[in-house]
């Protein structure tokens, strides 16, 4: 009597894998076009009297364009890393089970935040969101300094003096930045409590970005994909199974199986497509605000 065929779990047929591979190659082509055009796009300055130029002027020195260009630069950086990981060096695909999702998540977050900042038609709301983003960054910087100070205690008088000076300098920078932020808010007619709490939750940012999108039209997909990629960025045994295929290689006869875990190629299609579409949305919003003349 022949041994039973080893069972597959959560697998895909060769035809399904090939179809998914073709879709991934097409998305990679889109990503490469975005990466290749990034440097050219990043050098385009806002048109005089455009909405972005006007936003920058009234919030100076905390410019909205500084935030969005930084976010798109970072998204492009993750795109380049993603393309490198996907290339097996022989003209084919290299599909890692988990590592790709960390970069996909980062692209989604940078793109969503860019769209969240730029999509409101009301200039007051765009500026309020920009100040909220800056407030969040200042809070992080302060927490980082505090974390450093809670590390290994200084052992010598010189070390204590150096740390104390670094803390004073950091606090001075924070006070200066907070004062500048308040002045910008006042110039925009924005109350402190409208921005000082910082950014909303990522789920709210993603909902807003997908609602303003011409590609998703408020669909659930961006937030769902973000939740998946976030889950795969953190340690988890069960979440890996959502994107993996398992092939039984040995049955120990006591309820224990040995399995080989491989990437399920089809599970990468929706995350890649979502990240690419969200980045295209963000690029469209930046182009639009740089070109559209502000109404006075």
Regions found by a protein language model. Give the residues of each.
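Intrinsically disordered, low-complexity coil segments
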Residues: 90-94, 123-124, 128, 211-219
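Secondary-shell segments that build the walls of catalytic and ion/ligand-binding clefts
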Residues: 2-66, 138-296
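Internal, hydrophobic cores of structured domains that mediate oligomerization or house catalytic pockets
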Residues: 97-150
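Solvent-exposed, amphipathic alpha-helical segments
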Residues: 74, 78-88, 136-143, 228-232
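Residue-level detector of alpha-helical recognition elements and their boundaries
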Residues: 90, 122-123, 244, 290
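Long, hydrophobic/aromatic-enriched structural stretches that serve as scaffold segments
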Residues: 55-119
């Amino acid at each position: 009597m022949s041994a039973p065929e080893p069972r597959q779990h959560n697998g895909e047929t060769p035809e399904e894998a090939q179809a998914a591979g073709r879709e991934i190659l097409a998305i990679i082509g889109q990503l490469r076009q975005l990466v290749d055009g990034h440097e050219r796009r990043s050098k385009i300055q806002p048109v005089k009297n455009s909405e972005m130029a006007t936003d920058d002027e009234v919030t100076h020195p905390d410019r909205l364009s500084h935030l969005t260009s930084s976010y798109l630069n970072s998204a492009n950086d993750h795109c380049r890393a993603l393309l490198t990981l996907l290339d097996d060096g022989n003209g084919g695909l290299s599909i890692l089970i988990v590592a790709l999702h960390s970069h996909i998540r980062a692209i989604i977050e940078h793109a969503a935040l860019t769209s969240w900042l730029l999509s409101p038609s009301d200039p007051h709301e765009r500026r309020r969101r920009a100040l909220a983003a800056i407030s969040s960054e200042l809070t992080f910087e302060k927490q980082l300094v505090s974390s450093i100070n809670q590390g290994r205690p200084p052992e010598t008088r010189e070390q204590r003096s150096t740390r104390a000076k670094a803390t004073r300098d950091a606090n001075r920078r924070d006070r200066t930045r907070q004062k500048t932020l308040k002045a910008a808010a006042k110039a925009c007619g924005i109350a402190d409590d409208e921005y000082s709490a910082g950014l909303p939750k990522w789920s709210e940012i993603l909902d807003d970005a997908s609602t303003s999108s011409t590609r998703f039209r408020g669909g659930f997909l961006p937030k769902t994909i973000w939740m998946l990629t976030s889950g795969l960025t953190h340690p988890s045994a069960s979440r890996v199974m959502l994107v993996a295929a398992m092939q039984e290689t040995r049955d120990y006869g006591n309820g224990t199986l040995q399995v080989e875990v491989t990437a399920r190629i089809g599970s990468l299609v929706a995350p890649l497509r979502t990240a690419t579409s969200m980045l295209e949305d963000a690029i469209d919003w930046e182009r639009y605000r740089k070109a559209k003349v502000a109404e006075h």
